[in-house]
C-alpha cells in the first residue's frame, strides 16, 4: 500500500518514533508498565491540563473518545440531576443520544452548525431554569471545525454554580487551556487527537471532588469512571480490564514529543500555521471556506464544493494517489469536504497539498 498523510481529525498521521514504540510487548501487571508508563502519563496529562495539579486527576478508559463521553455523562449525572447540552454539531447531538439511552433528565439547546454556541442564550437559559445542575458542550466541533467560546461559556456556567463537562476531544493538547482557571469539572479527550497518539483509549481530566461524587452512580460496569479511577489509584496504574498496552506506550512517546516540541503553545502555533498555509493556498485556487475566519479552529477546515456536480470521490481518489487522505463533509445544509491540520504534519506538507490540488482536475 502506498503511504499517505492522514489529513483527518484523528486518527491522524503519527511520527515514526510513536509507531516504533508499539513494536514491544508489555505485561499488564508489571510495574514497568503500570507504574513507569501508566502512572507517569496520568500525571503528565494533569500537568498539561492545569497548574493546579492537586485539585485534578486523570482517568484512562479503553475505547474511543465517545466511550469517555458516555462514561462521564453516565456517572456524573445523578438521578436527581438535570443536564443541559449545548450543541452545534454531530458530537453535541451525540451527547443527547447518550442521555436518551440512559434516561437522564436533559435538555438540548441546538444551534446552527455554522454558528457558535451562543453565550447570551446559554446565560439566559440558566437564569430561567434553576433545575439544571450540569452543562456540557463540545469545544472544537469537528463536524465543521468551529471553535466554541470556551472561556465565555465556562464563565456563564460557573457563575450560577453549575457543573461543567467539556468535550475537548479535538482541542486538548493543541489549544492552550487551564481546566482549573476555567472551572471545568470534567474534560474529555482521546489518545489519537492533538497529543498525536494512536486510537485505543480516551481519558478524562476530572476535579477530584466531583469524581468522588460519581461513586455508585454509573449506569455501566465497564464505563464506571469512579471504579476505574479507584483501581488506578490503588493499583498504581493498574486497569480494571485488559489495557491497550501498545497504544498506551505509543501515547507515552507522543506526550514526550509534545514536550520536545515546546508544549501545547508551540503545537498550537504549528497547527495555526498549517491552517493558514492550507486556507491561503486553497483560496488562491478558488475554494471557499464554510466558516468565517473568526470562529474557525486550527484543527480541521471545511471547504465548500467548488462547483455544481463536483465529484468528491474522484477528488479524494486523486489526492490519495498523490499521498494525501482528506475527509468528506458532515453537514446537511451544504456540500463540503474537510481537511485536518493536526498530527505529525507541517506547513510544507500543506504547501505540497495545495500544489497537488492545483494539478488535479476537479
UniProtKB/Swiss-Prot annotation:
InterPro entries: Aminotrans_V_dom (IPR000192), NH2EtPonate_pyrv_transaminase (IPR012703), PyrdxlP-dep_Trfase (IPR015424), PyrdxlP-dep_Trfase_major (IPR015421), PyrdxlP-dep_Trfase_small (IPR015422), SP_NH2Trfase/AEP_transaminase (IPR024169). The gene is phnW. Homodimer. Its cofactor is pyridoxal 5'-phosphate. It comes from Bacteroides fragilis (strain ATCC 25285 / DSM 2151 / CCUG 4856 / JCM 11019 / LMG 10263 / NCTC 9343 / Onslow / VPI 2553 / EN-2). The modification N6-(pyridoxal phosphate)lysine is found at residue 193. Involved in phosphonate degradation. SUPFAM superfamilies: PLP-dependent transferases (SSF53383). This is 2-aminoethylphosphonate--pyruvate transaminase. Keywords: Aminotransferase, Pyridoxal phosphate, Pyruvate, Transferase. It is an enzyme of class 2 (transferase).
